[in-house]
A protein has these predicted regions:
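Predominantly a Rossmann-like dinucleotide-binding segment in NAD(P)-dependent oxidoreductases
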Residues: 122-169
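Rossmann-fold dehydrogenase core element
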Residues: 104-121, 142-147
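Short active-site oxyanion
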Residues: 26-30, 64-66, 166
């Protein structure tokens, strides 16, 4: 059993939490968000323990890995803390909006030899999976070229835009 702490409970964080719950090899031990009411609400939905400071998860020796799905501006700070406690890390994209900060983070964490993955693919996107299934079944024909336009089904809120990972800046 791999014990996980989920940090950040926005749209993508909740999606990761639900996906983790579906896998019998993972236990979502903690959930955290800067919004305490949201933390409590989502902890009930995901049958997890609410925490109100990420350091609780970092210091817990039972936690094997952290999923960082908080706002982009918090990613590096959380990663730097997680590596000190030898946690495996999954971090949503982007790591940061500033290449110098990213390079500095890389230098700082290398001495810890961390297990870290950035969520930068659409491998499990339902639309992509459906396309693959249809191709395998031969319903589409011979594949020659794919051009993809990727977007959410609805525009994001103004509140989200203020802390988004830079796609709208």
């Amino acid at each position: 059993m791999i014990n996980i702490a989920l940090l950040g409970l926005g749209r993508i964080g909740v999606m990761h939490g639900k996906n983790l719950m579906r896998n019998k090899d993972f236990k979502l031990k903690y959930v955290y968000d800067i919004n305490k009411k949201l933390t409590l609400k989502i902890s009930k939905e995901l049958k997890s323990n609410p925490i109100y400071n990420p350091s609780v998860a970092f210091k817990d020796r039972e936690i094997d890995a952290v999923f960082i799905a908080s706002t982009t501006s918090t990613h590096i700070k959380l990663i730097l803390e997680a590596v000190k406690y030898k946690k495996a890390i999954f971090c949503e994209k982007p790591l940061d909006l500033n290449i110098n900060k990213i390079n500095n983070c890389k230098k700082k964490i290398n001495k810890f030899n961390p297990k870290i993955q950035l969520g930068f693919n659409r491998r499990y996107d339902p639309g992509h999976n459906n396309l693959k299934k249809e191709l395998i079944k031969g319903r589409i024909g011979k594949l020659e070229k794919i051009i993809i336009t990727s977007r959410d089904p609805a525009p994001p809120s103004i509140k989200y835009l203020k802390v988004s990972g830079g796609i709208f800046k």
